[in-house]
Curated annotation (Swiss-Prot):
<feature type="binding site">
    <location>
        <position position="27"/>
    </location>
    <ligand>
        <name>[4Fe-4S] cluster 1</name>
    </ligand>
</feature>
<feature type="binding site">
    <location>
        <position position="13"/>
    </location>
    <ligand>
        <name>GTP</name>
    </ligand>
</feature>
<keyword id="KW-0949">S-adenosyl-L-methionine</keyword>
<keyword id="KW-0342">GTP-binding</keyword>
<keyword id="KW-0479">Metal-binding</keyword>
<dbReference type="GO" id="GO:0046872">
    <property type="term" value="F:metal ion binding"/>
</dbReference>
<dbReference type="GO" id="GO:0006777">
    <property type="term" value="P:Mo-molybdopterin cofactor biosynthetic process"/>
</dbReference>
<dbReference type="GO" id="GO:1904047">
    <property type="term" value="F:S-adenosyl-L-methionine binding"/>
</dbReference>
<dbReference type="GO" id="GO:0005525">
    <property type="term" value="F:GTP binding"/>
</dbReference>
<comment type="similarity">
    <text>Belongs to the radical SAM superfamily. MoaA family.</text>
</comment>
<feature type="binding site">
    <location>
        <position position="189"/>
    </location>
    <ligand>
        <name>S-adenosyl-L-methionine</name>
    </ligand>
</feature>
<feature type="binding site">
    <location>
        <position position="249"/>
    </location>
    <ligand>
        <name>[4Fe-4S] cluster 2</name>
    </ligand>
</feature>
<feature type="domain" description="Radical SAM core">
    <location>
        <begin position="4"/>
        <end position="227"/>
    </location>
</feature>
<feature type="binding site">
    <location>
        <position position="155"/>
    </location>
    <ligand>
        <name>GTP</name>
    </ligand>
</feature>
<feature type="binding site">
    <location>
        <position position="24"/>
    </location>
    <ligand>
        <name>[4Fe-4S] cluster 1</name>
    </ligand>
</feature>
<feature type="binding site">
    <location>
        <position position="266"/>
    </location>
    <ligand>
        <name>[4Fe-4S] cluster 2</name>
    </ligand>
</feature>
<dbReference type="GO" id="GO:0061798">
    <property type="term" value="F:GTP 3',8'-cyclase activity"/>
</dbReference>
Length: 319
């Protein structure tokens, strides 16, 4: 369907949990989070009802996120049920891949088509520091397994932070020359824990691109969040997601469902609607989703204000 600004909204990002098996420095506090009561989070049946209703309004792309979606039991069943909705054409997942190696075959059989893997360092000790305990070898094995079963293109999402991992930019770029792997560099955002790092850690996409004159621009869809480039010898592309220096609101095609059941029309807006109040009434649910999508804000103002208006942390919304 179209929002009131004429944008086609066909993409729903679903955070199935706010819990995670890592504690990335820009996402979660070091002590972790307080576990929510079961009644305060969306059950699979409720998530499926929202996905089904959204599909009736023109949503045909679903991405499951977290927290970390793979820590939830039976996530493959939710993917399978979603894949049986005829109008859903693409099901993807964003994961830290710690648990992916042993699950990726079943996930693919269930209907998962693509994975984005959050990976902010290729160095074992640094990865452990950024994630506060993660084992990078599990991620590497998951990538190898995913490639071996034809789960591609695989995209790696990398949040670049000055003084923390910006010396690895070339190493990440070179992955696209060796493997059928896309890399997405994401600007650090002043949201949640990222606020603490933003002043000293922010690097613009433009600064990175300007230092690599051999990058070749690649044509992108209007709704893409990334500006795409590649090297002459690249197997896949290199993307730059630039919410701070070059926002992509004019072509935004997505809304977000949080693990608590709130529908956020914009990642950086404080406006959201609690759909848990409507999942027992199909018509009311459909109407509320329709209303929320239609009233999606024209744009965020994070560039001007240097801070997200969202009151939620990234692990609650889904990155």
């Amino acid at each position: 369907m179209l929002d009131k600004h004429g944008r086609k909204i066909n993409y729903l990002r679903v955070s199935v949990t706010d819990r995670c098996n890592l504690r990335c420095v820009y996402c979660m506090p070091p002590e972790g989070i307080v576990k929510k009561e079961h009644d305060n989070i969306m059950r699979y049946e409720e998530i499926f009802k929202v996905v089904k209703s959204a599909s009736l309004l023109g949503v045909n792309k679903i991405r499951f996120t977290g927290g970390e979606p793979l820590i939830l039991k039976d996530i493959d069943k939710l993917i399978y049920n979603t894949s049986k909705i005829n109008s859903i054409k693409d099901i993807a997942m964003t994961t830290n891949a710690i648990l992916l190696e042993d699950m990726v075959e079943e996930l693919k059989k269930a209907g998962l088509k693509r994975v984005n893997i959050s990976l902010d360092s290729l160095k074992e000790d640094r990865f452990k520091s950024i994630t506060r305990g993660g084992d990078i070898n599990k991620v590497f094995k998951s990538i190898e397994k995913s490639l071996s079963i034809g789960m591609k293109p695989i995209k790696i999402n990398t949040v670049i932070m000055k003084g923390i991992n910006d010396d690895e930019i070339d190493d990440f770029m070179n992955l696209t020359k060796k493997y059928p792997i896309s890399v997405r560099f994401i600007e650090l955002m002043p949201i949640g824990e990222g606020r603490k790092l933003y002043k000293d850690g922010y690097i613009s996409s433009e600064e990175i691109i300007s230092k690599h004159s051999d990058l070749i621009p690649v044509e992108t869809e209007k709704s893409s969040t990334a500006l795409l480039y590649k090297f002459k010898e690249s197997k896949e592309n290199i993307g730059f997601i630039s919410p701070m220096s070059c926002k992509f609101c004019s072509g935004c095609n997505r809304v977000r469902l949080t693990s608590e059941g709130t529908l956020k029309p914009c990642l950086h807006s404080e406006k959201e609607v609690n759909l848990k109040n409507y999942v027992g009434n199909n018509q009311a649910l459909l109407s509320k989703i329709n209303e929320t999508i239609y009233n999606k804000p024209l744009e965020h103002h994070m560039i001007e204000e240097k801070e997200s208006k969202s009151k939620k942390m990234m692990y609650q919304i889904g990155g």
